[in-house]
Amino acid sequence: MSQKWGLVHIYASYNNTILHVTDVTGAETIAKVSGGMIVRNQRDESSPYAAMQAAFKIAELMRDKGIDQVHVKVRAAGGQKSKNPGPGAQAAIRALSRAGIKIGRIEDATPIPHDGTTPKRKNR
């Protein structure tokens, strides 16, 4: 049986967690699920529970398309915002592996500024 690879982009901020599955080139979207699609309350969108449920849902959609192995790209807000991924990133990766999806590489794709715009000043 041939193994089909996919690419899971996990955008984890402190407001939401978005999981987006593409083919290996990143050109064709296969499935997309966010924490806001899972929970009812807006405050729970970024929670590890919402990320876990989104990962289980996306694993099911991937299996329907025949993808059983993935590489993972984790991304935080970055730029002038937080460079640390939100609480849902680790939970989503753990849930993907629990759902039976084999994980290849895990890569950080957070954008880092190379001296672009001036950050907001701190309050005194």
From Swiss-Prot:
One GO CC term of this entry?
Answer: ribosome
Key word Flavoprotein present = no
Would you say which domain of life the source belongs to? Archaea
Region Disordered, residue ranges = 104-124
Q: A GO term (biological process) for this protein?
A: translation
Q: Please list the GO terms describing molecular function.
A: rRNA binding; structural constituent of ribosome
Tell me the Gene3D superfamilies matching this sequence. Ribosomal protein S11
Keyword Metal-binding, does the record have it?
Answer: no
The family database entries (Pfam families) matched by this protein are listed as: Ribosomal_S11
Q: Which InterPro entries match?
A: Ribosomal_uS11 (IPR001971), Ribosomal_uS11_archaeal (IPR019961), Ribosomal_uS11_CS (IPR018102), Ribosomal_uS11_sf (IPR036967)
Q: Which PROSITE patterns match?
A: RIBOSOMAL_S11
Q: Which keywords has UniProt assigned to this entry?
A: Ribonucleoprotein, Ribosomal protein, RNA-binding, rRNA-binding
Similarity annotation: Belongs to the universal ribosomal protein uS11 family.
Q: How does it assemble?
A: Part of the 30S ribosomal subunit.
- Function of this protein? Located on the platform of the 30S subunit.
This protein is called what? Small ribosomal subunit protein uS11
Q: What is the lineage of its organism?
A: Archaea, Methanobacteriati, Methanobacteriota, Methanomada group, Methanococci
